[in-house]
Amino acid sequence: HYDRSARRLFLLDYDGTLVPFASHPRLAKPEPKLLRLLDGLSADPRNQLVLLSGRDKTTLEDWFGSVKMDLVAEHGALVKEQGNPWEMVKRLSTDWKSKLIPILKTYADRVAGTFIEEKEFSAVWHYRNADPERGSLAAHELTDDLLAFTANIDVQVLQANKAVEVKNPGIHKGIASQRWLAKGGFDFVLAIGDDRTDEDAFGVLPEKAYSIRVGRGPTRARFQVASPDDVVSLLGALVKRGTGEVFHPLAGAATYH
């Protein structure tokens, strides 16, 4: 358990996990309080922190470059270990962008309150600010259109949280997580995430690892909590811990599944 462990690995998602979702991705910048919390967690030499995000590398480096942690951008397409430059985990194509981004733009023009976020190896149509019913319906239509159009194109179409994402296949948080798990020697592993992209990470964890899904829904995680506030409380408690207590992910954690 936590106090007696010699090497600890934290695999943390960002949006919807450490912070609530914002109306626009750029508005979800971490507060100084959260950065201090991550600094406190990473200050323990036994702790290895990895931020696994769908975000682009520039945003992650701008927001978290000062924290002693490794960064994973675009669900695993790009990795930056502390002290090293960003690296592309495998050769990825962006040829699909010229064909598919116009489809996303059509929907962004057609559905009020929606917009596109283009990243290096992926693109997202966000509908968080749209009329809920109209946005949800359009998301299904867009997904169908993209799947039909991409039958012969090597890309993956994902329905995310109030978003539809197009990305390169064979890249996901499970593969990214294995990069650290394969190093071995971790006797405490904790993974926390909130959506289907995080399920890939939960699926590759060692049997005794702790996994927490934020929010309800079917999950591979061992525990579920209600909100990012619960996650921050948990991590804060770990920073402040004394010794000798048995680790349990939040007194308020529940197993819904």
Question: What function would you assign to each model-found segment?
Answer:
Residues 3-23, 51, 177:
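Asp-based phosphoryl-transfer active-site loop
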Residues 5, 31, 169, 174-257:
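Mg2+-dependent phosphoryl-transfer enzymes with acidic/Ser/Thr/Gly-rich catalytic loops
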Residues 9-11, 70, 190:
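Hydrophobic "anchor" residues on beta-strands that sit immediately upstream
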Residues 16, 71, 125, 177, ...:
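Residue-level signal for inorganic ion chemistry
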Residues 29-119:
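Active-site phosphate-binding/coordination module
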Residues 55-74, 134-154:
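Substrate-recognition/cap helix-loop segment adjacent to the acidic, metal-dependent catalytic center
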Residues 74, 80-98, 158-186:
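Substrate-recognition "cap/lid" segment bordering the active-site pocket of phosphatases
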Residues 114-133, 154-167:
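Charged, glycine-interspersed solvent-exposed loop segments at helix/strand-loop junctions
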